[in-house]
Swiss-Prot record:
Designated name of the protein: rRNA adenine N-6-methyltransferase
Enzyme class: transferase
Keywords: Antibiotic resistance, Methyltransferase, RNA-binding, S-adenosyl-L-methionine, Transferase
Gene label: ermG
Organism: Lysinibacillus sphaericus
The UniProt record lists the keyword Methyltransferase: yes
Length: 244
């Protein structure tokens, strides 16, 4: 298997005007502690340190770490960690938020890490637009797994010409808001099994025919290919009742 090279998928937003437009879409204040995924050349980092209490910028490229340090000489409220985000360990205590323009080719891995391996209350991420839409698609396992832990929204579509070099596709600014109640480990394993069988249309492994009809009726589902997350949760709850 070829090793993923994060550096090969780096596209930067450098225009102050475009950066300001994006920053105005997110909610940050002077009390916030932020982890930034991919400091790049420090263009967003420079805005984050002005608005937040403290910024921890994680950047895999040592040369870009130095570029960012030189850009932030007048600011004491930051640290740069030269590390691979997929190997980085987020703290499990104290409230914090995450911001990042993440590489398209490892977007799934990064988002899974944020949702399942961090305790971030809110994450603002710039991702490929098609990927953002797939995160809202309840016919996909990734979306259903994430929605159990976070609320997902698209805040803005970001045109490809904002980036240099210009990618072939548009991007989106999304927000992941942590739900108040974290799913217990045992419950999550049962939920994961349900999700995978549902997405693979293995309904007969989840319900008897009679149970399935009752579960669909209770959730008010008339088209199993077009359901809301709330309806999916209703199905899962019915599954738990039928299976003790």
């Amino acid at each position: 298997m070829n090793k993923v090279n994060i550096k090969d998928s780096q596209n930067f937003i450098t225009s102050k005007y475009h950066i300001e437009k994006i920053m105005n879409c997110i909610s940050l204040d002077e009390k916030d502690n932020i982890f930034e995924i991919g400091a790049g050349k420090g263009h967003f980092t420079a805005e984050l340190v002005k608005r937040c209490n403290f910024v921890t910028a994680i950047e895999i490229d040592s040369k870009l770490c130095e570029v960012t340090r030189n850009k932030l000489l007048n600011y004491p409220n930051y640290q740069i960690v030269n590390d691979d985000i997929l190997k980085f360990t987020f703290p499990s205590h104290n409230p914090y938020k995450i911001f990042g323009s993440i590489p398209y080719n490892i977007s799934t891995n990064i988002i899974r890490k944020i949702v399942f391996e961090s305790s971030a209350t809110i994450s603002y991420l710039i991702v490929e637009y098609g990927f953002a839409k797939r995160l809202l698609d309840t016919n996909r396992s990734l979306a259903l797994l994430l929605m159990a832990e976070v609320d997902i929204s698209i805040l803005a579509k970001i045109p490809r010409y904002y980036f240099h070099p210009k990618p072939k596709v548009d991007s989106a600014l999304i927000v992941l808001k942590r739900k108040p109640a974290k799913m217990a480990f045992k419950e999550r394993k049962k939920y994961e099994t349900f999700v995978m069988k549902w997405v693979n249309k293995e309904y007969e492994k989840l319900f008897t025919k009679n149970q399935f009809n009752k579960a669909l009726k209770h959730a008010r589902i008339y088209d199993i290919n077009n359901i809301s997350f709330e309806q999916f949760v209703s199905l899962f709850n019915s599954y738990k009742i039928f299976n003790g």
